[in-house]
Amino acid sequence: MPLHNLTRFPRLEFIGAPTPLEYLPRFSDYLGREIFIKRDDVTPMAMGGNKLRKLEFLAADALREGADTLITAGAIQSNHVRQTAAVAAKLGLHCVALLENPIGTTAENYLTNGNRLLLDLFNTQIEMCDALTDPNAQLEELATRVEAQGFRPYVIPVGGSNALGALGYVESALEIAQQCEGAVNISSVVVASGSAGTHAGLAVGLEHLMPESELIGVTVSRSVADQLPKVVNLQQAIAKELELTASAEILLWDDYFAPGYGVPNDEGMEAVKLLARLEGILLDPVYTGKAMAGLIDGISQKRFKDEGPILFIHTGGAPALFAYHPHV
């Protein structure tokens, strides 16, 4: 088993049982293609989401280092920050969140509802900044200030997307391969590609476990030219940690995120409504709605390698629906 080195890394178990991998019969009929969905939106903390897989490794490392504070950064409506704050609460740690308003809105729901509301419930210390122009440097500067106040901070990068956090999605690839074995031969896997850890972790894992399946990242914030090096660098860093080779080509589609990160578009919102009405499953306006718009258009434009079954990775994010109301 090529991924045996995963067990070398300390890991807290927040998720327990594998998340469901489900067939979508009504959605499949609508699109004329077999569509399956990996339900990482139903991980069991703080309204679910993919970041919990990364936090199993990152929080374990924080405890190993003797930290009493988790520090991270993101947008006001960051799913990652919400899940980090929940993990901190569960472990009895302080959480400091450096937040930006990337869409420059004054809409009350965006500023106070959705994920931002949940941060207050988790007793998160909020620090606002004008923009996360250099988040790694800004997080280190914040950590220095927090340390000067007598805390022992552990910095978690935006999205939990470093090599250690991304191991959570190598682990997820193992889970997916086990769920598909003997049941379905997945031709293509579609995932939202943002901070790149989920995409890169899946790329490393699926290359070794399901090499016949193509993995497509639908970008939510950047062009292919800007996103590709982020994913490739993480892919190689993960492979180095696991003492593996990673030579799979990284495939990205950047046609679906305009006008920009965190700004809903018509195609993404149509995808949100479609899955809700056909399957009772909630996507979000920022990540999964746009990724699903890519899947839908990819079928109509014949962009996939063949007409075999497609697996959509549902990374969560439904709390943002409340933040973006009445625009959804």
From Swiss-Prot:
GO biological process: cellular response to sulfur starvation; D-amino acid metabolic process; D-cysteine catabolic process; sulfur compound metabolic process; sulfur utilization
Temperature sensitivity of activity: Optimum temperature is 45 degrees Celsius.
Record keywords, A-Z: Lyase, Pyridoxal phosphate, Stress response
InterPro entries, sorted: ACCD_DCysDesulf, D-Cys_desShydrase, D_Cys_desulphydr_bac, TrpB-like_PALP, TrpB-like_PALP_sf
GO cellular component: cytosol
Entry annotated with the keyword Lyase: yes
CDD domains: ACCD
Protein EC: 4.4.1.15
Induction trigger: By sulfate starvation.
Source organism superkingdom: Bacteria
Cofactors: pyridoxal 5'-phosphate
pH dependence: Optimum pH is 9.0.
N6-(pyridoxal phosphate)lysine PTM positions: K51
Catalytic activity entry: D-cysteine + H2O = hydrogen sulfide + pyruvate + NH4(+) + H(+)
Molecular function as annotated in GO: 3-chloro-D-alanine dehydrochlorinase activity; D-cysteine desulfhydrase activity; protein homodimerization activity; pyridoxal phosphate binding
Subunit architecture: Homodimer.
Role: Catalyzes the alpha,beta-elimination reaction of D-cysteine and of several D-cysteine derivatives. It could be a defense mechanism against D-cysteine. Can also catalyze the degradation of 3-chloro-D-alanine.
Family indicated by similarity: Belongs to the ACC deaminase/D-cysteine desulfhydrase family.
The protein's name: D-cysteine desulfhydrase
Protein species of origin: Escherichia coli (strain K12)
Lineage: Bacteria, Pseudomonadati, Pseudomonadota, Gammaproteobacteria, Enterobacterales
